[in-house]
Amino acid sequence: MKKILIMAGGTGGHVFPGLALAEALADKQVKTVWLGTCNGMEKQWVDAAKIPFYTIAISGLRGNGLLGWLKAPFNVFKAWRQARYIIQQEAPDLVLGMGGFVCGPGGLAALSLNKPLVLHEQNATPGLTNKLLAPFAKKVICAFPQSTIKGKQVTVIGNPVRSGLESLPVVKAHSPRHLLVLGGSRGALALNEMVPEALSLLPEEQRPQVIHQTGQKTLQQAMSSYEAANVAADVVPFIDDMVSAYQQADLVVCRSGALTVSELMAAARPAILVPFPYAVDDHQTANAQALVDLNGGEVLQQADMTSELLAERLQFWMADKRCETASRSIRESAPHSAKEKIVDELLTLCDSSVH
């Protein structure tokens, strides 16, 4: 039985694509084990998926000051030894890095043991670890063609996304329009305030039906904003059935995390994207550009956004079949079947490593 060790940690943006691949690999009779960090949130998700879970002691360098940088070589060496021991014990056919601090020492350990290393980069702007490891990897799989990682080992496939999105029909003309606002698990305060204000500036006959997902922490703030603006909306902390939510939507207003942009592509839903302004290396702006390049939306920087500007852009997109045209453009040009294609790549590399 083939075995793949998956390295991922830190945020859902790294962990959830790894879990999607682990599930698809299990369907192909491939065993997976997981390497994460001691203090990351990934353990609860991986345990829930019943995947054997190992940890190493490593954390990020950004924001740790001079002392953190001075300690870094010793911490990386210690984590490298831990990862090397785990890889020796598990003896995987291949090591897959999905992102997070764990991939630095884990990737170096895999290389030191001559294990094939595959990297998956979810964002258009690669993280530091992937940039450093990419020249030594057997394969680098990128989500977006805008990625700055280059080389003969690089291939653009996409991000694994939830099942059912790619089979959704494209947007069809109807009235009223349906607007989906996604604040993410932690909420987006700027969207909570700005979207209700913008909608209040539209004539009532032009206002769309609204579903606004806020996250638990900002639910009350968003509900108060809609009430103050005298705008009707279905405000919810979480959406259990995202496929249905995308199916109903004609237009989406959201941040531009890698998985959100990939889901928009898979669902063929146009969007007004408001990148999180404090993202590392401004990677959300680069992610957003991937959808814009498919004629599937536009970027509004939070610093430039006013309720008047957002109202004008909402009117623009909801008029003259622009949503329908953009939806068709996305469906015709966006990557598809990413999960299946990545699994095929991994199985091929596993076979070549055995022989």
UniProtKB/Swiss-Prot annotation:
SUPFAM superfamilies: UDP-Glycosyltransferase/glycogen phosphorylase. UDP-N-acetyl-alpha-D-glucosamine binds at residues 11-13, 123, 162, 185, 239, 258-263, 284. Belongs to the glycosyltransferase 28 family. MurG subfamily. Keywords: Cell cycle, Cell division, Cell inner membrane, Cell membrane, Cell shape, Cell wall biogenesis/degradation, Glycosyltransferase, Membrane, Peptidoglycan synthesis, Transferase. This is UDP-N-acetylglucosamine--N-acetylmuramyl-(pentapeptide) pyrophosphoryl-undecaprenol N-acetylglucosamine transferase. The gene is murG. It holds the Pfam family Glyco_tran_28_C. Cell wall formation. Catalyzes the transfer of a GlcNAc subunit on undecaprenyl-pyrophosphoryl-MurNAc-pentapeptide (lipid intermediate I) to form undecaprenyl-pyrophosphoryl-MurNAc-(pentapeptide)GlcNAc (lipid intermediate II). Its EC number is 2.4.1.227. Gene3D superfamilies: Glycogen Phosphorylase B. Pathway: Cell wall biogenesis; peptidoglycan biosynthesis. GO terms for biological process: carbohydrate metabolic process; cell division; cell wall organization; lipid glycosylation; peptidoglycan biosynthetic process; regulation of cell shape. It comes from Hydrogenovibrio crunogenus (strain DSM 25203 / XCL-2).
